[in-house]
Design a protein with these regions (language model features):
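Amphipathic alpha-helical repeat scaffolds
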Residues: 38, 138-146, 259-263
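RNA substrate-binding interface of SAM-dependent RNA methyltransferases
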Residues: 47, 82, 88, 93, ...
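Active-site/ligand-binding-proximal alpha/beta "capping" segment
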Residues: 206-255
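Structured adenosyl-cofactor binding patch, chiefly the S-adenosyl-L-methionine
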Residues: 106-109, 149-153, 167, 171-178, ...
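Glycine/small-residue-rich loop that forms an oxyanion/phosphate-binding "nest" at active or ligand-binding sites
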Residues: 80-110
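Boundary-proximal intrinsically disordered activation/regulatory segments immediately upstream
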Residues: 1-52, 56-76, 164-165
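Glycine- and other small-residue-rich loops at beta-strand/loop junctions that grip anionic moieties
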Residues: 8, 34, 135-136, 161-162, ...
């Protein structure tokens, strides 16, 4: 079997400049590639399930950049051997140049950017609870945290509508701890999505500071879709009007709202509490 590992020793190597450039959205768009940094994140990417009733995003890794000097564990080589693609080995100083992290662990995978629009034709069934819709999210770290929380709370599907950010921004991947690859996450049209779920018997709840109903007052054992809006502007009028009810979280201080990711977490874990009663 030919040796797939190539050694890079110069900062000026074109491959170094190319992979470092994928930190920028314009380069990701042009190359139709994005990078996945970290052992945990890459591990989840290569084990993502695209054959479930609601498939996860497909991940096709095309190259791997490694620096054994930065490895933090004992399983890195096994992971490297499981990925069938060209491998580029770099010294620590060069790897740190391309890394997105303060303390890199020596692993960056480059993957093809998948089509992230909802694949309605590939969804075998929609019978999961709850479902989460995020409208107009602006901060990559917030979206990543929401995905991590949603996966932990047993959410069956996340749809991002009218996103202000790139779904494959390195901060989204990092803050999600790789759950962007193990949880079905897609981009969709708000009206189409809400109409689709209404036809499937879902209750649609818009969570907003001025919501009429306290979030703990509804029956979350029923098939539920929860809508959350952007950090700055909240939910659009369309989102509120197309929902069956509007929910609010109690605010006892001077602040008028909570962080978007925290609000999602509170509602989703109330859903767990009710479903487990």
């Amino acid at each position: 079997m030919p040796n797939r590992r190539q050694y890079i020793t110069s900062f000026s190597n074109p491959k170094v400049k190319w992979v470092a450039g994928l930190k920028e959205k314009r380069n990701r768009d042009e190359e139709k590639k994005f990078f996945i940094e970290g052992y945990r994140e890459i591990k989840k990417a290569i084990t993502s399930n695209s054959n479930s009733p609601i498939p996860c995003l497909p991940v096709n890794i095309t190259s791997l950049f490694i620096s054994p000097e930065c490895f933090l564990g004992e399983n890195e080589e096994a992971l490297i051997n499981s990925v069938k693609c060209p491998i580029f080995e770099l010294p620590r100083k060069i790897f740190e140049k391309i890394s997105y992290r303060d303390r890199p662990d020596g692993l960056i995978a480059v993957a093809e950017t998948p089509d992230a629009h909802v694949p309605w034709d590939k969804i075998k069934s929609i019978d999961t609870n709850p479902i989460l819709i995020i409208e107009g999210v602006e901060k990559p770290g917030n979206l990543g945290t929401i995905l991590r929380t949603a996966e932990g709370a047993g959410v069956g599907l996340v749809i991002v509508t009218d996103p202000r950010i790139d779904l494959f921004n390195p901060n989204v991947v990092r803050a999600s701890t790789g759950t962007i690859f193990t949880l079905p996450v897609y981009i969709g049209d708000l009206k189409e999505v809400l109409t689709k779920f209404q036809s499937k018997g879902y209750k649609r709840y818009a969570v907003t500071p001025e919501g009429k109903t306290l979030y703990t007052s509804i029956n979350m054992k029923e098939k539920s879709v929860f809508l959350f809006g952007s950090e700055q502007y909240g939910l659009s009028d369309d989102a509120k009007q197309l929902s069956d009810d509007t929910l609010h979280l109690p605010m006892l201080g001077e602040a008028d709202s909570l962080n978007l990711a925290m609000s999602c977490g509170i509602v989703l874990y109330e859903s767990i509490r009710q479903r487990n009663k």
